[in-house]
């Protein structure tokens, strides 16, 4: 348990940041789920729109420090590969 005022304040700050970061991470997962659903349905147009939104949200999380840059890039790369595969299959 924190004994001095500075440590108590740090605990309060950490709790606030954790709440914000959890919300951001949840938002990213929501957009990733929308992309997954579009891929599962096989709808290329919806998947492309969902990809743009998911990529934007992932990169925003990276810039805010919620997701490591390499993790964000890896996820975007894998999403793009899946979209490309779906696009080829549909064509």
Curated annotation (Swiss-Prot):
Keyword RNA-binding: yes
Sample GO molecular function, one term: structural constituent of ribosome
Keywords: Ribonucleoprotein, Ribosomal protein, RNA-binding, rRNA-binding
Keyword Ribosomal protein in annotation: yes
CC terms in the record's Gene Ontology section: cytosol; small ribosomal subunit
InterPro entries recorded: Ribosomal_bS20 (IPR002583), Ribosomal_bS20_sf (IPR036510)
Gene Ontology BP terms: translation
Family according to the record: Belongs to the bacterial ribosomal protein bS20 family.
Function: Binds directly to 16S ribosomal RNA.
Entry protein name: Small ribosomal subunit protein bS20
């Amino acid at each position: 348990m924190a004994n001095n005022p500075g440590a108590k304040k740090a605990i309060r700050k950490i709790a606030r940041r954790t709440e914000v970061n959890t919300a951001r991470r949840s938002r990213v997962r929501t957009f990733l789920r929308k992309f997954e659903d579009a891929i599962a349905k096989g709808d290329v147009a919806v998947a492309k729109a969902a990809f743009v939104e998911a990529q934007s949200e992932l990169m925003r999380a990276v810039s805010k420090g919620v997701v490591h840059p390499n993790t964000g890039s890896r996820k975007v790369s894998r999403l793009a590969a899946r979209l490309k595969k779906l696009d080829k299959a549909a064509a």
